[in-house]
Every structure is written in structure tokens, then in C-alpha cells.
UniProtKB/Swiss-Prot annotation:
It comes from Alkaliphilus metalliredigens (strain QYMF). GO terms for biological process: trans-translation. One of its GO terms (cellular component) is cytosol. This is SsrA-binding protein. Residues 132-157 have a biased composition (Basic and acidic residues). Pfam families: SmpB. GO terms for molecular function: RNA binding. It comes from the Bacteria. Residues 130-157 are annotated as: Disordered.
């Protein structure tokens, strides 16, 4: 589902499994040149990442961007805290979400859009174990139905 001029670099598939995502936002990231080069090579891990609101600004924590190989002294700490760029209205909306009990800001996807590194930030509530099991059972039954339909259509031909 990549839009025109958009190249996906990292996807957090586990986020939809662990969280019930209610809304998503597109945010820019404040990066150093060597970090951008490393991200373009796909050397970013957002699985353990999360975002926090501090002083009406949003910061991305625990996202690992591997050091750029030719970066030498210009490389920064791979796990440093990075500021996210959003409009004030979006930040206010996110503050409203996070003040409600149980809501978390989760990085969903990192992609290039017209040469700029963007982050899709999801707002979600953590799923309980029984919710995860229910989702897995639903997906499994859908897979079985599709398999049966495929076999029936092959038999008709």
C-alpha cells in the first residue's frame, strides 16, 4: 500500500499484534546526516520503540539506528532520543489520547516520502492475552475459509 513517492524502510508488525491501534499520525524525525544514510540502507529497528510527550514535544525512545559505516566521528549514539516533528494541533490531540489511561504512542512504520524520512506513529491500547488469542483464532479461521474456497474453485474448473 505504498503511495506514490513512498518507500517503506521498516515496519513494526508486532505493534498491531500487541496494541489495538485507534489512530495514526505522520511525523518527521530530527536526524543527523549519517543517521539518514543508515536509515536509507534499512539499518533501523523500531520494534522496541515508543514515543513520549515531554514539555509539549514528542520524543522517540529506544529506536536503534545502526551507525553508518563511513560515518566515523559523525556517528551518533544508536539509541539516542530523537525529536518528532508534528503540528501543534496534532500534538494536542496526542496529549489528549495519552492522558487517557492505557494509551501508548507506538512507531508503526518508517518510510521515505519525497526524500524525507517519515515515521507513522500509532496511538493504541495494549491488548490483553485473551484479545491476542482471539485475534489469532480469527485469522486462523479466515485462512482456513480462504483455503477451502480456493480448493473448491479449483475443483469446479
Amino acid at each position: 500500500m505504498a503511495e506514490k513517492g513512498q518507500k517503506s524502510l521498516a515496519v513494526n508488525k508486532k505493534a498491531r499484534f500487541d496494541y489495538l491501534i485507534e489512530d495514526t499520525f505522520e511525523a518527521g524525525m530530527v536526524l543527523v546526516g549519517t543517521e539518514v544514510k543508515s536509515i536509507r540502507q534499512g539499518k533501523i529497528n523500531i520494534k522496541e520503540g515508543y514515543a513520549r510527550i515531554e514539555n509539549s514535544e514528542i520524543y522517540l525512545h529506544n529506536v536503534h539506528i545502526s551507525p553508518y559505516e563511513q560515518g566515523n566521528i559523525f556517528n551518533k549514539d544508536p539509541l539516542r532520543i530523537r525529536k518528532l516533528l508534528l503540528h501543534k494541533a496534532e500534538i494536542r490531540k496526542l496529549i489528549g489520547y495519552v492522558q487517557q489511561k492505557g494509551y501508548t504512542l507506538v512507531p508503526m512504520k518508517v518510510y521515505l516520502q519525497n526524500g524525507l524520512v517519515k515515521l507513522q506513529l500509532g496511538v493504541g491500547v495494549g491488548k490483553k492475552l485473551h484479545d491476542k488469542r482471539q485475534d489469532m483464532a480469527k485469522k486462523d479461521s479466515q485462512r482456513r475459509i480462504q483455503k477451502e474456497l480456493g480448493q473448491r474453485q479449483k475443483g469446479m474448473e
